[in-house]
């Protein structure tokens, strides 16, 4: 068994080989033994594993609540029958699958992230195996009494097709263009050769890398994920893609990397110092780029990174300017294809659109242009009708 197991692991050798040849995005930079082990061991994500019993309880509740629906309820019932059948017919397989199921669930519930479903795949696979055994038990029982092969075949077909009818509506993404549209609209909000800082990873940053590197859309824009800046490999990635950004702030980058080395290598470090160096580095990126290119942030970037600068709403982003004057801006035509389904990601994208119009409305309201402000607040409600902020501002205008 050791030889097939080793052959299976050999697929990981692709990572250091490819990383050594300057790929389009060298995620984790697994070109050395240390970084290779960090990469396959998920070192970057360990801060979210075994973080708290409260998080584990929430994830366990989510798993238990969602499991029956994953198998259209009937699948779980048949799976329990199959589990009982395994106990009688194959005790070793029963124990093996129970251990796989429990260890998968125990490990996964201790990972405090939103997109947890894929980490339960092994547990789902065990339920599928139990369901298959359950079908065998049920059909064997029916066949021994009825001997109606056509009925048995019809039963199998119905059970197999049931999840398709139950899940199709909530799994169909064929008309979901929310991320694509939001990414293109964000690009449309930025002037040529722009630099933008954001950590809206799920909503447009990750998609922007695909559109830039694969499709060649807006390669002039430097998109920087603020949270990935906490990783040394990402700073090397930026040095490869945007050498001017790192070179102009070399002193601040090196000061941060000295502290980051301690954190990444589990050495004693001062949280206040590493955070101060982190803020100083990003502030340097921003201030040293203002004279040569338009610089933007998205709304979630904290004010400590942009001290002394005005945030001017421009499309879906905020342009940073070193003055307090009013700068009239235009909202680019936004392509928005609605998607009826609700969910964490879908609802947040609608809110991000609304928030952009609210910020625009507030900017114009404070400049004394109530008409433009009202238009912006009403537009915000078109994207997120339940959002209280534009409603409150509209009441303030008409007070």
Predicted feature descriptions by range:
Residues 14-56:
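Extracytoplasmic catalytic-loop and juxtamembrane helix elements of membrane-embedded
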Residues 184-195, 209, 215-399:
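C-terminal luminal/periplasmic domains and tails of membrane-associated envelope-modifying transferases
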């Amino acid at each position: 068994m050791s030889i097939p197991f080793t052959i299976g692991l050999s697929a990981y050798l692709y990572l250091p080989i490819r990383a050594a040849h300057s790929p389009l995005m060298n995620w984790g930079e697994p070109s050395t033994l240390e970084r290779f082990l960090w990469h396959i061991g998920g070192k970057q994500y360990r801060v979210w594993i075994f973080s708290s019993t409260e998080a584990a309880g929430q994830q366990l509740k989510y798993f238990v609540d969602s499991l029956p629906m994953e198998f259209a309820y009937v699948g779980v019932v048949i799976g329990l029958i199959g589990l009982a059948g395994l106990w009688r017919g194959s005790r070793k397989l029963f124990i093996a699958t129970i251990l796989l199921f429990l260890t998968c669930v125990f490990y996964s519930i201790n990972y405090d992230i939103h997109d947890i479903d894929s980490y339960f795949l092994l547990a789902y696979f065990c339920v599928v195996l139990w369901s298959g055994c359950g079908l065998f038990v049920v059909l064997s029982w029916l066949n021994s009494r009825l001997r109606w092969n056509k009925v048995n075949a019809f039963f199998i077909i119905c059970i197999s097709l049931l999840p398709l009818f139950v899940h199709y509506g909530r799994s169909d993404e064929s008309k979901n263009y929310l991320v694509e549209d939001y990414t293109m609209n964000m690009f449309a909000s930025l002037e040529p050769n722009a630099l933008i800082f954001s950590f809206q990873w799920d909503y447009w940053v990750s998609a922007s890398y695909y559109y830039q590197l694969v499709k060649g859309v807006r390669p002039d824009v430097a998109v920087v994920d603020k949270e990935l800046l906490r990783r040394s490999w990402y700073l090397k990635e930026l040095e490869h893609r945007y050498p001017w950004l790192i070179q102009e702030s070399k002193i601040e980058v090196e000061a941060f990397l000295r502290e980051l080395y301690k954190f990444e290598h589990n050495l004693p470090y001062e949280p206040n110092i590493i955070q101060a160096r982190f803020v100083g580095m990003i502030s340097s990126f921003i201030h040293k780029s203002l004279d040569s290119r338009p610089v933007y942030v998205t709304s979630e970037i904290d004010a400590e990174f942009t001290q002394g600068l005005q945030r001017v709403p421009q499309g879906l982003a905020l342009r940073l300017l070193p003055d307090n004057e009013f700068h009239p801006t235009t909202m680019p035509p936004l392509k928005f294809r609605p998607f009826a389904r609700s969910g964490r990601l879908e609802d947040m994208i609608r809110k991000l659109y609304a928030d952009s119009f609210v910020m625009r409305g507030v900017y114009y309201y404070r400049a004394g242009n109530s008409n433009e402000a009202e238009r912006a607040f009403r537009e915000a409600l078109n994207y997120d009708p339940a959002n209280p902020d534009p409603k409150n501002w509209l009441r303030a205008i008409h007070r």
